[in-house]
From Swiss-Prot:
Residues 34-43, 91-110 have a biased composition (Basic and acidic residues). The keyword Phosphoprotein does not apply. Keywords: Cell membrane, Lipoprotein, Membrane, Palmitate, Signal, Virulence. PROSITE patterns: PROKAR_LIPOPROTEIN. Residues 26-119 are annotated as: Disordered. This is Immunodominant protein p72. May play a role in virulence. Its main location: membrane. The gene is p72. It comes from the Bacteria. It comes from Mycoplasma mycoides subsp. mycoides SC (strain CCUG 32753 / NCTC 10114 / PG1). It is a lipid-anchor.
Length: 532
C-alpha cells in the first residue's frame, strides 16, 4: 500500500497531491493528535515535491494549521481541520447563511409592521372600576367634590395604578382627560365616564378608555332629615306683638340674639336704643306690653316640637320688614345639636317665614299713628328774636303784609332748619292700638333734658318704628303775621316733617339698605307766638 501511494504521488500533478494530502492528514488526525509538537520548517533547497512520510514517526498534525505563515507560496494548500472549525464543511466561496441571516430578535415582527397585533391587549384585562376606598381624603368627600379635587390634582389616580397595576404603570404614560363629560353621582358615591389616556412608552401609540371611580361618600337621605321641616312651624295666629311695628320686632330679634353684633349701631348718648327696648320698658310701653327678647318673640311667632328640639337648634340669620304694609319676614337656620351623634351627618337647612298681620304706618291719617311732633311756643318765641325769623318778621311788618303766608327760601334757611330740628319734641300717644306709651316727653335732637328717639347711628330710630329724621326732613317753612282782637301782632310758623316709612329685603339689618320704594309720613306742625 505504501509503495502504491508513493508511485501515485510521483505521477499526479501538484493540485491533486494537495487534495490527497488533505485526505491523508485528516485520516491520520482522527487517529492520533499531538498538539504539543511544533511543525518542522521545510528545507528550501530541496525539490518542492511531497516528502516521504517517515514510517518511524507518528504524523505531525500541526502541518494542517492554516495560520502557519512560514509555508512557502509553492507549498501545497492545507485545509483546516474540520474538528477544530465546524464551519469548514461550508464551501469557501459561499457565505455562511446561518451567520448572515438576521437573528429572530432583530427581525421586524410581522404584526408590528402590519399593525395587526393589538399592543394594548393588556389594557383589556384590567378592571375598569377604580376604587378610592383606601384614601380617607376622598372617602370623606362626595362625588361632586372629589371630581373637582381630581381635576385640580389627579396624582391619586397615578398612585393607584403604580400600586395595583404596576406593569401597566411602567409600560404606559397615563393621563387623566379632565372636563371630558365625566359625571359625578353623589347618591351612589361614584364618578362615571372618566377618560384615561394610555400612551405606550415604546411605540408612542395611545388609547383612551372609560373608567368608573368609586368609594366616595354617599349622600344618604333619611326620614329624620325631613324632621327639620317639622321642628318649627308658623303659628296660624300671632297675638300680642302684632300691635307693634314689624321693624321694631325685627331689630330686637337680631339684637337680643347677639348683642355684640349690633352694639356698634347704637348711639351712646341720652337716646332710646336696643338696651331701652329689650325685655320691656314701662316708660315706653303700657304695663301689659309683651317682653321684647328673642326667646319671647320666637315663642309668639312659632310653634316648636319639643322632642325634635332635643335634636335640633335654630338661629335667626336674617329679617325683612315692611312698615307700610305691616309685613315681617324671619329667616331661620336649623342645625343639629353638637352633642347628638344620631344627627351629625344631617345637613343644615334654612326656612323662611312671612307674617303679614303686623301694624302698619298710616300715612293718610296720623291720628292712627303713635308718633307726633311739636314745637313749643316758648322755643318759637325765642327763635323769633334772632336770625332769619327776626329779619323776616321785620320785613313783613314794615310792608304791612298781614295774614299772608310767605315761603322762606333764604340762603340762611339751613340754619333755621337746624334750629327747628333741635327744638322739636316728640310725643308718643297710642290712641289706636294702646300699646306704645311714653311717660315723658322725648325729642329728636339729643340733649340733657329730653331723651332722643334717634338712638341708632346716623340719625335713625327703632322706636316707635325704624326711620330717619334730620334737619333736611323739614320742608315747606311758611311764616305769616296776624293781629288778634286785642291788636296784638302774632307770628305764625308752619312747616312739614317728612318721615320715611321703610321696607327691606332679607338682611342682617346691619346696614340701612331699603327697597327704594319709600313712602312718607308727613307731619304738619303749626305754632304761634306774640311779637313786639
Amino acid at each position: 500500500m505504501k509503495k502504491a501511494t508513493k508511485l501515485l504521488l510521483s505521477i499526479l500533478p501538484i493540485s491533486s497531491i494537495s487534495f490527497l494530502s488533505v485526505v491523508s492528514c485528516s485520516t491520520r488526525n482522527s487517529n492520533a493528535k499531538q498538539p504539543d509538537k511544533k511543525p518542522e520548517k521545510p528545507n528550501e533547497n530541496t525539490p518542492k515535491t511531497p516528502s516521504k512520510p517517515d514510517e518511524s514517526k507518528q504524523p505531525d498534525n500541526n502541518n494542517t494549521n492554516p495560520g502557519d505563515s512560514n509555508n512557502g507560496s509553492n507549498n501545497p494548500e492545507i485545509k483546516p481541520d474540520p474538528s477544530e472549525n465546524p464551519q469548514s464543511d461550508q464551501p469557501m466561496d459561499k457565505p455562511d447563511e446561518k451567520i448572515d441571516k438576521p437573528s429572530h430578535s432583530d427581525k421586524p415582527q410581522a404584526d408590528d409592521s402590519n399593525n395587526n397585533r393589538d399592543i394594548f391587549s393588556d389594557l383589556d384585562k384590567i378592571s375598569k372600576e377604580i376604587s378610592f376606598e383606601t384614601f380617607s381624603f376622598y372617602t370623606q368627600r362626595d362625588a361632586v367634590t372629589a371630581l373637582v379635587d381630581l381635576q385640580k390634582d389627579p396624582s391619586t389616580i397615578y398612585t393607584i395604578f403604580s400600586k395595583d397595576y404596576k406593569t401597566i404603570f411602567d409600560k404606559y404614560h397615563i393621563q387623566f382627560l379632565a372636563n371630558n363629560e365625566e359625571s359625578a353621582n353623589n347618591e351612589k358615591g361614584l364618578i362615571e365616564k372618566v377618560k384615561l389616556k394610555f400612551t405606550h412608552k415604546k411605540f408612542d401609540q395611545s388609547k383612551i378608555l372609560d373608567f368608573i371611580f368609586t368609594g366616595f361618600k354617599k349622600n344618604e337621605y333619611t326620614s329624620i332629615t325631613n324632621n327639620k321641616e317639622k321642628y318649627i312651624t308658623k303659628r296660624e295666629k300671632v297675638e300680642k306683638i302684632t300691635d307693634l311695628f314689624p321693624s321694631l320686632i325685627g331689630y330686637v330679634l337680631l339684637y337680643s340674639q347677639d348683642h355684640n353684633q349690633y352694639k356698634n349701631l347704637m348711639e351712646a348718648k341720652n337716646v332710646i336704643n336696643f338696651e331701652d327696648l329689650e325685655n320691656g320698658n314701662s316708660s315706653l310701653f303700657i304695663d301689659k306690653a309683651p317682653l321684647l327678647n328673642v326667646a319671647t318673640i320666637k315663642d309668639y311667632l312659632f310653634e316648636f316640637n319639643p322632642e325634635l328640639g332635643k335634636l335640633y337648634k335654630e338661629k335667626i340669620t336674617a329679617v325683612k320688614y315692611d312698615d307700610y304694609n305691616g309685613i315681617l319676614g324671619v329667616k331661620l337656620e336649623i342645625e343639629n345639636r353638637d352633642f347628638d351623634p344620631k344627627t351629625t351627618k344631617e345637613p343644615i337647612i334654612e326656612k323662611e317665614f312671612v307674617f303679614d298681620n303686623f301694624r302698619k304706618v298710616n300715612i293718610k291719617d296720623n291720628e292712627k299713628n303713635p308718633l307726633s311732633l311739636f314745637l313749643t311756643q316758648d322755643k318759637f318765641k325765642e327763635m323769633t328774636k334772632s336770625g332769619l325769623l327776626k329779619t323776616k318778621i321785620q320785613e313783613l311788618r314794615s310792608s304791612n303784609k298781614l295774614e299772608k303766608k310767605e315761603l322762606l327760601q333764604d340762603k340762611k334757611i339751613d340754619f333755621l332748619k337746624q334750629q327747628i330740628f333741635k327744638n322739636l319734641l316728640v310725643d308718643i300717644n297710642d290712641n289706636s292700638h294702646n300699646i306704645y306709651r311714653s311717660q315723658s316727653t322725648l325729642s329728636l335732637g339729643s340733649n340733657k333734658t329730653y331723651k332722643s328717639i334717634l338712638g341708632l347711628a346716623g340719625g335713625f330710630s327703632i322706636y316707635p318704628f325704624h326711620t330717619s329724621i334730620n334737619k333736611d326732613s323739614i320742608k315747606n317753612i311758611y311764616l305769616s303775621i296776624n293781629k288778634d282782637e286785642e291788636n296784638v301782632h302774632k307770628a305764625i310758623i308752619e312747616f312739614e316733617v317728612y318721615i320715611p316709612v321703610f321696607s327691606t329685603g332679607f338682611s342682617d339689618l346691619k346696614s340701612y339698605a331699603t327697597s327704594g320704594d319709600e313712602k312718607y309720613l308727613v307731619l304738619k306742625i303749626v305754632q304761634t307766638t306774640s311779637i313786639q
